[in-house]
Amino acid sequence: MAILNELYPSVPYNVLAYTPPSFLPDAGTQATPADLTAYEQLLKNLEKGINAGTYSKAIADVLKGIFIDDTINYQTYVNIGLSLITLAVPEIGIFTPFIGLFFAALNKHDAPPPPNAKDIFEAMKPAIQEMIDRTLTADEQTFLNGEISGLQNLAARYQSTMDDIQSHGGFNKVDSGLIKKFTDEVLSLNSFYTDRLPVFITDNTADRTLLGLPYYAILASMHLMLLRDIITKGPTWDSKINFTPDAIDSFKTDIKNNIKLYSKTIYDVFQKGLASYGTPSDLESFAKKKKYIEIMTTHCLDFARLFPTFDPDLYPTGSGDISLQKTRRILSPFIPIRTADGLTLNNTSIDTSNWPNYENGNGAFPNPKERILKQFKLYPSWRAGQYGGLLQPYLWAIEVQDSVETRLYGQLPAVDPQAGPNYVSIDSSNPIIQINMDTWKTPPQGASGWNTNLMRGSVSGLSFLQRDGTRLSAGMGGGFADTIYSLPATHYLSYLYGTPYQTSDNYSGHVGALVGVSTPQEATLPNIIGQPDEQGNVSTMGFPFEKASYGGTVVKEWLNGANAMKLSPGQSIGIPITNVTKHNYQVRCRYASNSDNPVFFNVDTGGANPIFQQINFASTVDSNMGVKEENGVYVVKSIKTVEIPAGSFYVHVTNQGSSDLFLDRIEFVPKIQFQFCDNNNLHCDCNNPVDTDCTFCCVCTSLTDCDCNNPRGIDCTLCCQVENQLPSFVTLTDLRNITSQVNGLFAPGTQNRLAQNISDHDIEEVVLKVDALSDEIFGTNKKALRKLVNQAKRLSRARNLLIGGSFENWDAWYKGRNVVTVSDHELFKSDHVLLPPPGLSPSYIFQKVEESKLKANTRYTVSGFIAHATDLEIVVSRYGQEIKKVVQVPYGEAFPLTSSGPVCCIPHSTSNGTLGNPHFFSYSIDVGALDVDTNPGIEFGLRIVNPTGMARVSNLEIREDRPLAANEIRQVQRVARNWRTEYEKERAEVTSLIQPVINRINGLYENENWNGSIRSDISYQNIDAIVLPTLPTLRHWFMSDRFSEQGDIMAKFQGALNRAYAQLEQSTLLHNGHFTKDAANWTIEGDAHQITLEDGRRVLRLPDWSSSVSQMIEIENFNPDKEYNLVFHGQGEGTVTLEHGEETKYIETHTHHFANFTTSQRQGLTFESNKVTVTISSEDGEFLVDNIALVEAPLPTDDQNSEGNTAFSTNSDTSMNNNQ
């Protein structure tokens, strides 16, 4: 039994000891396939799994997200997953783990894949059919399935043999026979791709070529992945026979040729198909062309853009992945797209003259960084409609406001009663990812004076779904949506076009079609490099020049994942970059040019120019390494390897040549440069960071005829240990200075208490100096001093109310998804935390000190050391964020270590004449009387408040300072009293909202046990009727990506409803009786289709008497005496028939006639056979079906009559909501 005090206890959540505030997507919110953070988290898990040998578990989680949770798009995840291609992985390579991702049935995890799991090829078929605007024929299905079945068999053999080798300890532990078996499988797979790939795009029919291209793109990716493994892992597998150095050189040639071939093929087939659509003349042709572009982009072009990254010479294996951002935008097919019920799109003109950046389909579409959506303003008008002459809206115009301008599509209403306008405010942090619309296609019943031109798709209902699953209502009636357009996964609506219908009367000009611009979420992120992951790996980053802040002209490209920037002679372009980690980076540029062009390249860090020189960008026309696209052949050019400091900087590029230059992207490859053999200037560059846990192949290279004036270099992966040589103190003066500083850490006359003003960072500065004392000269002294410093550190930890103030206990902190701890910083002895730029996830750390740790009427000091910070907010709160400061701290360079001077930075004078350290912060917070019941404690957090901000912080402390004076006690009592009043007011409000819901959910379950079984008489409607309340604070006050206490309550409510719903689904004989999976499991006749009601519910709509759905069920352990109950919830006039019997057919008919949503039942049904066909039909006009269930009747009691009773209950406008 759930009771109020369990869900909403008198003591709020205990941050450290109890269940912590969980991340929003992990606690029952409506995660959507648009949420890029979910893909990033699953990708991190896969990366860890590949290196740890647990990748099958990571892939199982992905498959669950795809086929069970419906939060992951298969195609999108695979595409993002290819960024792992450059990882330094074990000898299994990258292809083996991906087999289980491409073919769900081959993922060797303990738990079987979801029962509805498909391979990626089968999962593509609905999109392919949508693209070619028809279903696949039986011959086409046979052809595609046969080819993929052959590949799956070969992949399974490859995987099985690799598993066998690994089970024996690896390639150096098995005999030559098993190695030969494996290499045979490798070569067989390679031959399959070489031989069979062309058959997918060589056919006499255009449709066959187009439908085969998505298969071709995936298969080409698989082949290039296999070839890369052969090149990088082949010498480990079999260096003597099949993968000798000469053979590897041959495979290198193959991968380069195939990258060009596969890219050209996809581009040529796409362009040929695109040309066949011509210039759209009406909405019908426009919709088909845009759908073709959308699916070809997400299923083909987005894969082809990654092909060059498979070349290990161009993108060598390191310990980090590769991230090449895409900025290309996609136009949706026009909305509405349904053509049933009399809506004809042929010959319906489309007017694009008012569309910014459209340029007849050849433009770049509105730049999402320049035009940020702010608001939609809708202008509806009203006409007589259904059900007793009620007025129904239709949309005349929509006004789109962005950060640049306001633009009107359509015209303001001139006829009929007018209402509105209605406003839809848009939150850029929670963008729109789905548009739901209803359109009139036939005159409503009883509508007098109806104008037939309004039959051509007038909008009568409109709403929008946001990324977090919440819905924005446009304030229009209609109640449901017959058109649902979901933007491609990980995209958002960055702009909205509209087009009017042109008619010959005064209804001309009303808006009937909307066109959305879909933009990848990463397109608006700042350009960040040097951000390490949890293992310290730094990714290679590539940013489209389309993200430049000035200069150049946007030109269309299809294969790059971004439009190119054309730089005419004399023009310049600048792109802003933020570097998180001071580091060496190889700066590269991908470009195309028809002739040689001198280019001035300037990397401007604001105080230096690591690159400031003219560089020749050679003609790429005849390049053997390039990929030909719309504006030329694109190649990657290395500019220079330089050290770039942490912070923001600009890259400026000026075309000083005489012909156009086309810039695709700029890349930053993290490097460490080691210098060997100073006499002959031989240098070795290796990818950073070095992973000393990996086993690398040693390649010996002889260099002869070295020219000391012209150093030569080699690129390789180097595994080594680099000793950090600290200075050594050898004089008695050094010893006296350091001894004095060690003694100064303690209060006078004791070594059991720290001095009053000593911070944790002070102790760490001293230990650096102690460690630098010479072992040979001062060994005994050093040991004694180090013992004292260790004692000081223990005392510091003991007084610190924070757990893990130097991050020795990282689990004690709440942190943003991308926040990491880092070691080996010149200013820190201990680990420090790196707060990176926020990106899609907030960047923070947070901890709460519980009330039980505090003393009454006491002042506490909150302090810490900041090595570097840009836009770092420091928040300390007890009664309401008493301390809230945003600080900027310059990058702290370590001074040469001396025995007397500071480690970092020259102290500056403060207002009271003392010396202060700009890197050290210290604040005070007062605690009055203790309040154990409400447990306010002291909450402490650091977070980044701007997109390009960052910080490195450590030595965080909350420690007791002194007792409060009398006047300070009075002040804090007044603040505490006000806080308690507001707290109790909100608590009373929340209690009044949640107690009724607790009571209703208790009523669903036997013995009111939310983890037990639901009662036998529970129906879908009982669950749907429970409307979750809108609580005032669902998100944590500081951690915006986590639930508050109230949010956790809502998650528990939703979890209990979900469990009840799942049990009901298991108990009913009908599959998908709630129509949550569209009309799956039902046979449709006529125009039965799903719509979305205004409250967000998805229901089945039967528009007239010619529409019906049916389902045949088979009862296990059939008993003709067993009784069943039919429960139906719907609106309108219709019937449910149940046909059963073998030799003699019996039909049971249940009639449902209700103007509002109502539950009706038929009890005590018996059947004459184990097969029953259930049919739902409309009798007259629109019939809306919310849910239907057929369940075993409970055993009757004495006062029950089961003679086919019929009952009903009315419940209009009810829903199961999860308000955010």
From Swiss-Prot:
SUPFAM superfamilies: delta-Endotoxin (insectocide), N-terminal domain, Galactose-binding domain-like
MF annotations from Gene Ontology: toxin activity
Gene3D superfamilies: Galactose-binding domain-like (2.60.120.260), Pesticidal crystal protein, N-terminal domain (1.20.190.10)
Residue ranges of the region described as Disordered: 1194-1220
Signal peptide start and end residues: none
Keywords: Sporulation, Toxin, Virulence
UniProt record, GO biological process: sporulation resulting in formation of a cellular spore; symbiont-mediated killing of host cell
Pfam families, sorted: Cry1Ac_D5, Endotoxin_C, Endotoxin_N
UniProt entry tagged with the keyword Transcription regulation: no
CDD domains the UniProt entry points to: delta_endotoxin_C (cd04085)
Classification via InterPro entries: Cry_V, Galactose-bd-like_sf, Pest_crys_dom-III, Pest_crys_dom_I, Pest_crys_N_sf
Residue spans of biased composition, Polar residues class: 1198-1220
Sequence similarity: Belongs to the delta endotoxin family.
Miscellaneous note of the record: Toxic segment of the protein is located in the N-terminus.
Function per UniProt: Promotes colloidosmotic lysis by binding to the midgut epithelial cells of hymenopteran species.
Protein's UniProt name: Pesticidal crystal protein Cry5Ac
Classification of source organism: Bacteria, Bacillati, Bacillota, Bacilli, Bacillales
